């Protein structure tokens, strides 16, 4: 019944979001999310708020004043991104923290040697570090191979072995959140069940739990699929929430509501950064 009601609310939510405000609209679906979170004692923090496309720390701070979903401010770090070094990262963190001392500030790391590029003292200034698995290897021109762009994959199983090892290496990095877990490029999306076997899922979840890395539930993403989510909860994983915005427009949060209710998530299932435990 709840799933049917959530589906019924989607059209209204999409229409309200199209209005252009940076704040989340007051609609039936968002009211349901608010009720479910209150009932379960869950505080939702969006840890995947990119400062780009018109989104600013100021808008993020204003957004969280308007509704129950709290915001963060996150910069991208890497050789092919604007923020490449400690001084640039510190400037970003200081500016964001000056806007709101209650808003977690972090980065998305895109180079796999990022922890050698960023000094430990700079890392200590951050509240969280997020990574995804969607950049793997280099293209022929030497630039990062971004898996959301068209790929040529001749041998899916061979590619998957390499990609799974890539996932496990990222979990060995000192990160806080693994974003969009079990992602696959569009060329392999229809092979999800055969490529993401139970064994691979179990090993990934085991390492995430061991390392204390949260698994993201991303608004608008089909990943991870229900089989992974159920296994992750049963194995004691912690979850986080993210939107992965491209601009300042609020995203449809139906995915969050669906997973919270389907998995019967409680406050104890949700990851919290050290800065909010004080």
Residue ranges and their predicted role:
Residues 1-4:
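Positively charged n-region of N-terminal signal peptides that target proteins for export
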Residues 9-18:
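Hydrophobic h-region of N-terminal signal peptides that target proteins for export
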Residues 21-42, 192-278:
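Charged catalytic cores and adjacent phosphate/nucleic-acid-binding surfaces used
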Residues 24, 30-161, 247-250:
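A metal-dependent hydrolase metal-coordination microenvironment
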Residues 48, 129, 180, 215, ...:
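Conserved, mostly hydrophobic/aromatic
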Residues 59-62, 90-97, 119, 167-168, ...:
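Short amphipathic alpha-helical segments and helix-helix/interface helices
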Residues 67-68, 125, 173-177, 264-266:
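Short loop/turn motifs at secondary-structure junctions
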Residues 132-136, 143-235:
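Domain-core and long-helix interface of multi-subunit machines
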């Amino acid at each position: 019944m709840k799933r049917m009601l959530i589906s019924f609310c989607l059209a209204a939510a999409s229409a309200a979001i199209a209005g252009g405000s940076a704040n989340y609209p007051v609609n039936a679906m968002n009211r349901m999310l608010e009720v479910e979170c209150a009932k379960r004692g869950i505080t939702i923090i969006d840890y995947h708020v990119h400062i780009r496309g018109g989104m600013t720390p100021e808008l993020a701070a204003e957004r969280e004043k308007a509704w129950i979903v709290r915001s963060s401010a996150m910069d991208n770090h890497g050789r092919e991104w604007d923020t490449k070094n400690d001084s640039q990262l510190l400037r970003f963190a200081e500016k964001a923290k000056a806007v709101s001392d209650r808003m977690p500030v972090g980065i998305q790391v895109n180079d796999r040697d990022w922890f050698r590029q960023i000094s430990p003292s700079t890392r200590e200034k951050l509240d969280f570090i997020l990574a995804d698995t969607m950049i793997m290897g280099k293209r022929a021109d030497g630039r990062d191979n971004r898996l959301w762009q068209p790929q040529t994959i001749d041998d899916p199983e061979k590619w998957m072995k390499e990609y799974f090892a890539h996932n496990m290496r990222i979990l060995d990095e000192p990160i806080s959140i693994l974003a969009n877990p079990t992602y696959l490029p569009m060329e392999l999306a229809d092979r999800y069940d055969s490529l993401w076997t139970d064994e691979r899922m179990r090993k990934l979840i085991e390492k995430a739990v061991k390392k204390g890395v949260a698994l993201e539930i991303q608004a608008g993403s089909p990943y991870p699929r229900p089989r992974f989510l159920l296994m992750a909860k049963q194995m004691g994983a912690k979850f986080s929430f993210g939107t992965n915005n491209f601009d300042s427009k609020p995203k449809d949060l139906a995915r969050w509501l669906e997973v919270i209710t389907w998995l019967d998530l409680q406050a104890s299932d949700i990851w919290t950064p050290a800065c909010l435990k004080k």
